[in-house]
């Protein structure tokens, strides 16, 4: 399957590198030429525009920041939709609101294109080793057509339902991740109030029953302020804000309230 990939940021780059390392027939597009430098001297083809890519591939992964970016590469001037062959599969790895991905999928369908929302989790190291979790929303037959492609990136592909279901799951995951960072910060503050040695408490929390990936992020940073420069903060802030808008005061909204403490700390840093 000839594959395209757009979006070579912190997650998109290692995903594209994994596809290339696994021998996929790969075409890339990036707005910034420097993003393509890791592929210099390889067999990877470079497209000048998304439209040029669309004429060359059977499936394309999109890993840009938000829904506006997805719409731009799909339907903007020189977009994919005008040149992809009917039946081509578009995998949207970006985390967007479920209503937005359903709108994008509906518009793509008028061009004969099939869309799966396919947000990912696992971080850069797992992207490079093909061990991401990929959350799928969309048609089961469409998923079957790209199973081999996804297996290069993931050892845990979860089909959650119709288009939008994958995005719901990713928003829940990222909101929980943010909340866990905030709770780890609360735990360290509680220890400080009780006079517990901070380094010792951090060592306990990192190796005991409360340990998790998110708490480890906070403990290694020594404070929430120490996370302010992380590029992940923009994504987490976006996703927690989306989750708050979607969930409102429905059951589970307490999770959002805790996560918003992390968001508020990042905005004030």
Task: Please place each PLM-identified region on the residue numbering.
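NAD(P)+-binding Rossmann beta1-loop-alpha1 motif at the extreme N-terminus of oxidoreductases
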Residues: 1-62, 193
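Residues in the short beta-alpha loop(s) of Rossmann-like NAD(P)-binding domains
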Residues: 32, 66, 139
């Amino acid at each position: 399957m000839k594959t395209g990939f757009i979006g070579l940021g912190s997650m998109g780059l290692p995903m594209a590198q994994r596809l290339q390392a696994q021998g996929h027939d790969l075409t890339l597009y990036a707005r910034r030429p420097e993003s393509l430098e890791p592929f210099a001297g390889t067999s990877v083809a470079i497209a000048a525009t998304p439209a040029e890519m669309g004429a060359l591939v059977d499936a394309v992964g999109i890993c840009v920041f938000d829904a506006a970016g997805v719409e731009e590469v799909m339907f903007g001037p020189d977009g994919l939709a005008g040149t992809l062959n009917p039946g081509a599969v578009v995998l949207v790895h970006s985390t967007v609101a479920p209503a937005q991905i359903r709108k994008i999928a509906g518009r793509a369908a008028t061009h004969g294109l099939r869309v799966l929302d396919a947000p990912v989790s696992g971080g850069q190291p797992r992207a490079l080793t093909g061990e991401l979790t990929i959350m799928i929303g969309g048609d089961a037959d469409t998923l079957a057509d790209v199973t081999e492609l996804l297996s290069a990136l993931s050892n845990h592909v979860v089909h959650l339902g119709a288009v939008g279901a994958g995005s719901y799951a990713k928003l829940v995951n990222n909101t929980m991740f943010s909340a866990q960072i905030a709770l780890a910060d609360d735990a360290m503050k509680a220890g400080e109030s009780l006079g517990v040695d901070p380094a010792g408490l951090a060592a306990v929390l990192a190796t005991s029953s409360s340990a998790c990936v998110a708490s480890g992020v906070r403990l290694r940073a020594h404070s929430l302020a120490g996370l302010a420069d992380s590029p992940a903060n923009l994504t987490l802030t976006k996703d927690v804000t989306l989750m708050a808008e979607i969930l409102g005061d429905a059951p589970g909204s307490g999770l959002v309230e805790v996560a918003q403490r992390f968001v508020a700390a990042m905005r004030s840093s």
